Amino acid sequence: MSNAPEIVQRLIKMIMRAFYETRHIIFMDAILRHSALTDEQTALLMGIPIKECRFIAGKLREDRLLAIQSRTEMKEGQQRQYHTTYFYIDFCSTIDSIKWRMHQLVKTVEDRMRNDFDSKGYVCPFCNKKFSSLDVLSLVTNEGTFACNVCGTELKDDEESAEMMSSQKRLGKLMGQVNGIIDALKRVDEIVVPQNNFQSALEHAVPVSLDTQNLSQQNLSKSNSDVRLSTSSPSITVDFSADKETDEKRERNCDKQVKAAQNILPEWHATSTISGSITRAGAKDAALHSFRTETVNEVQDTKTDITSEKSALDAYYATLRAKQKEESEFMDSENVDDEEDDDFLDVTTATSLQNKSTDYGSVKRKTENLNSDSDIQNKRTKSIEENNSLPPIVSTNGITDGDTEMQESKKNVIINGFNEDDEDDEDEADFEDV
């Protein structure tokens, strides 16, 4: 337990609960109980990371409520030295800091109240007219007072102004809240506060129990695991339990039906008690009920269609697989037959040889016919050219009629492109073809 007097510990607790957050309150309570703690022990007791613990300690040290000391220590089973940070409270410094802050707080409120009092102005007690501090400068009388410019009555200070009333109310509220702290400071001034440096804090330090330390470690590990789970990347899981989903859907449908039955309007709301006809609310409820029924039926029909399509696809793929299997077996059997046929050699028969010789003879005759036709055509072309090279026939009186007829007959023969030699050649060519 700390060596500080009870009134000092009470003062520190009052200050922490009046002006600080919950985590700062827990931190200072732990230091007051154990007198001195390391950063690791404090983090374990509070169940927070060491980094956050040091951040809290830095804030309290800035306000001069906490003292921090670092030193090198040797841990058990290790030869390397480590820097260890200790937290403790220097009571004299803490009390002085509290006094100074309370003085600054009260002074700030009083200064604001004084400013409001200086600017409160003046008021006429007869006509209740108010004047500011600048307006009354032109209303000075020979006696050195201020007179009203309306009725001439002497002006008085406005003690009931809104600013003055709010300032007095603010100061009274503050003094009521800090009255306990001021009383504690007065009682602390009546006693002698012992010095609490780092050595004395270590001498009066209360060790952390193993049960508390183990419990804090479990809480810290649990909090860290929760943080890791909350900050981990999202994962996707696929659940193939179709039966479970079916049961859940069935339960949801049952719940919907029960809720729909509960939400049905009473009979005296749905139908008129006088005429017995359906009211507007009843018609609306009936339309909504029919819409829900149609929606459920459509969903069921859709599920049935999907099931039938799935069964048809399964049957189609089964037939396709059977057909592919039969085709593969048939191809295997054909490959076996081809391998057996390859074992035998092809034999050339006499008939095939005779057919080949016949084909060769027919090709030879066709070639000869083409050659003879080309010779005949050449002869015709040659005769036409010779005919064109002859000199023109000039008719004279000394030529007889018989000569004229002979020349005309030759001309006709040449023009037609035929002569007796050509006809004989054609007959011979026909004979050769036969």
From Swiss-Prot:
A zinc finger (C4-type) spans 124-151. Residues 226-238, 386-399 have a biased composition (Polar residues). It is found in: Nucleus. Residues 241-251, 376-385 have a biased composition (Basic and acidic residues). Keywords: Metal-binding, Nucleus, Transcription, Transcription regulation, Zinc, Zinc-finger. Pfam families: TFIIE_alpha. Residues 217-251, 357-408, 415-434 are annotated as: Disordered. The keyword Glycosyltransferase does not apply. The keyword Ubl conjugation does not apply. Recruits TFIIH to the initiation complex and stimulates the RNA polymerase II C-terminal domain kinase and DNA-dependent ATPase activities of TFIIH. Both TFIIH and TFIIE are required for promoter clearance by RNA polymerase. TFIIE is a tetramer of two alpha (tfa1) and two beta (tfa2) subunits. This is Transcription initiation factor IIE subunit alpha. It comes from Schizosaccharomyces pombe (strain 972 / ATCC 24843).
